[in-house]
Amino acid sequence: MSKKLTFQEIILTLQQYWNDQGCMLMQAYDNEKGAGTMSPYTFLRAIGPEPWNAAYVEPSRRPADGRYGENPNRLYQHHQFQVVMKPSPSNIQELYLASLEKLGINPLEHDIRFVEDNWENPSTGSAGLGWEVWLDGMEITQFTYFQQVGGLATSPVTAEVTYGLERLASYIQEVDSVYDIEWAPGVKYGEIFLQPEYEHSKYSFEISDQDMLLENFEKFEKEASRALEEGLVHPAYDYVLKCSHTFNLLDARGAVSVTERAGYIARIRNLARVVAKTFVAERKKLGLPLLDEATRAILLAEDDE
C-alpha cells in the first residue's frame, strides 16, 4: 500500500465504491445499538420481498467491551461500515474484494481468508450463514447471508457485509493502537474518542443506576407493545433498540443473573418478532412499492387467494 488513507478517507472511499455498485447511502440511525445489523436499514429491510441496497456507517455501542481507553483494540463504541444487498448479488465476494483494492489492499499480495463463522443474534431472532474475513491474520469483516430475521425466513436472501473500520484503519495505517489512527489530517482517533471511551466505561461499570435501568427496561418494553397495538412499527422498533441498549448496560454492570439474562433476551426477541411481522404486513398494505410491477402483482394476487 502506498498512500495511507485517513479514517475518514476510508469511509469516503467505501461510500463511493458501494454507491457505484447501486447502494443508497444512508446515515447512521439515531438510537443506541450494538451493531449495524440492528439499524432498521438492515433489520427491517432484510425481511419481506422488496429489494434493498444500502450502505452506511454505524457507530456501535457495546458497554461490556469498554476498557476505560486502556486497551488498544477493545472499545465501548466502535464504527462499522455496513453494506446490505437484497437480493444478494451472485458476485458479492468479488465485489467485496474489489472494495479492498479501492482501499489500496491488493488481494493478490495479501493472505485473505474467508473463515466460516455462522452468525446469530438471539435478541432479535436473527441468524444466517456467515464468514469472517481475515486479512493477514486479523479479522476485518463479517460476511453474512441472512436466513432468518426477526424470526421470519428471508426471501430473497439478503447479503450483509460489515467492515470493522477501526481494525481496517489500524491495518492500513500500520498502527498498533486504535487511538493512534489518523482520523483526519493531523487529528488522531484518541484525540476525539479517548475521553468519551473512558467516561462511558466508568459509567457502564461503576456509575449507572441499576434501579433506574431496570425501571426503564419495563417502560420501554410496555411502550413498544403499545406502539405495536397501534400498528406503529418504527416507533415500536425504536423502543426495542432502547430495551436492547438498556439490557446491555445492565449486563455490563453485572445486574442480571445468568437466568435473568436469558429472560431479558427472550423479551427483546419476542418484541422484535412482532415488529418484523407487523412491518411485513404494513408493507403489503402499502402495495410493496419498491417491487417492480410484475412481481408486485403476482405477490399481492397470491395474498388475495
UniProtKB/Swiss-Prot annotation:
NCBIfam families: glyQ, PRK09348.1. It is found in: Cytoplasm. The gene is glyQ. Keywords: Aminoacyl-tRNA synthetase, ATP-binding, Cytoplasm, Ligase, Nucleotide-binding, Protein biosynthesis. It comes from Streptococcus pyogenes serotype M12 (strain MGAS2096). Its main location: cytoplasm. This is Glycine--tRNA ligase alpha subunit. The keyword ATP-binding applies. Belongs to the class-II aminoacyl-tRNA synthetase family.
